[in-house]
Amino acid sequence: MRFVNTPYDDVFRTLINDCSSLIIPLINEVFGERYTGKEKIVFSPNEHFMNCQDGEEGERVTDTSFKIIAGTESKKYHWECQSSADSSMLVRFFEYDTQIALDEGEIKKDVLTVTLPNSAVLFLRCDDATPDRMKIEIITPGGTVSYPVPVMKSQQYGIDEIFEKGLLFLIPFYIFSHESRFKEYDGDKDKLGELQREYKDITDRIEQLLNAGEISEYTKCTIMDMSNKVLVHIARKYENVMEGVKQVMGGKVLDYEAKRIKNEGIEEGIKEGIVEGKAAGIVETGVDVGLSDKEILDKLQIKLNISLQMAQEYFSRYGK
């Protein structure tokens, strides 16, 4: 079964992949960690292949899974972005978590050891029915075990708290806090002006972080562009709201400025951290599920958009 991606999923993954340092403050906030931002982030492939009962190969796609390496210690994390809660979410979490664990499982002396990731969910919308915390409980022949799935609700964070805690990752989704008032803003210029002034404050604060050297030009442009992408989708029925906020946020920044910066060489470790991790995961998973060498090479080329020669290099590095 495949789940349809939303523009919000795309924004979430873009922020994770292109501005990976922004995830560190979220990890600290949700899991109570004390990462400094100097740690290494190594991404795992989002695609996980599973053998189904009918003999077909199934594929599941997570929003993101990665390791944070601090010195000699490392922890695995799995994050999902949800516009709202649904009844199948915990089932998907367990399915993803176990597959992530199996991808790096070890068998020693007839004992299989797997490590489940630290999992969490970011809710973009919330109401009284939205859980504050979730838990997965597993009843095994050896006893019952459980683990928590922490919940982060973006609508609970105001602008001051976002900037005080460095939760810049949440800025593109901040517009969800105003969603219930779109109709009011759309028909009242004064109220719309208040919203515009709030977003002017956001852009000014982002600019201050840039000038202070706390974020890069590329990160700034990505935050602005992803904010516009969310806005265009969520406010598509309210033209005044959409155009009013876009006017303050600066339009399609990423189409030229940030891409130019990226093409000039500011990759921020993407190739080292993401492509290497994805290649290793695709090869190792393919071998585990019994794919042929050709099938694994094909997946490397398609998933990573690389040449056959590069795929062969990855296969020889991470294969049998």
Predicted regions and their residues:
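Coupling/switch segment of ABC-type P-loop NTPase heads
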Residues: F163-K191
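Accessory alpha/beta interaction modules
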Residues: M1-F169, Y174
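Short, charged alpha-helical interaction segments and adjacent helix-coil junctions
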Residues: K67-S83, G105-K108, M152, D186-K320
